[in-house]
Amino acid sequence: MKDMKTIEGIIVVTTPEIPGYKVVEVKGVARGGTVRATHIGRDIMALLRNLKGGEVKEYTEMMAEAREEALRRMALHAKELGANAVVNFRFATSNLGGSMAEIYAYGTAVVVERVEK
């Protein structure tokens, strides 16, 4: 797996298979999530940007950080399950009120082995 990009030592792909590898064991669902809330500073900047129009960079950055954290937590959970990869990885989001959002990362934790050519 040294030639494959990993997160916390876990291969993570959105596809059901990993080229060059075969699934030898399914460990279950790996998951990781985080809830992020806005704060007054971000809200004020967002309001000002909203008046002008365009991207609200403060929220974009906050959500990017949240996705990375959810992804990292999912990889750590996969490792706890004894997996070395996650296939069929996805993100889900939900609004938890006016100023909070949950980012949830999930996929199938598996053990893969390199296929000999």
UniProtKB/Swiss-Prot annotation:
Q: Which Pfam families match?
A: YbjQ_1
- Superkingdom of the organism of origin: Archaea
Q: Which NCBIfam families does the entry mention?
A: PRK03732.1 (NF002989)
HAMAP family cross-referenced by the UniProt entry = UPF0145
Member of which family?
Belongs to the UPF0145 family.
| Name the record gives this protein | UPF0145 protein PH1682
Q: What species was this sequence derived from?
A: Pyrococcus horikoshii (strain ATCC 700860 / DSM 12428 / JCM 9974 / NBRC 100139 / OT-3)
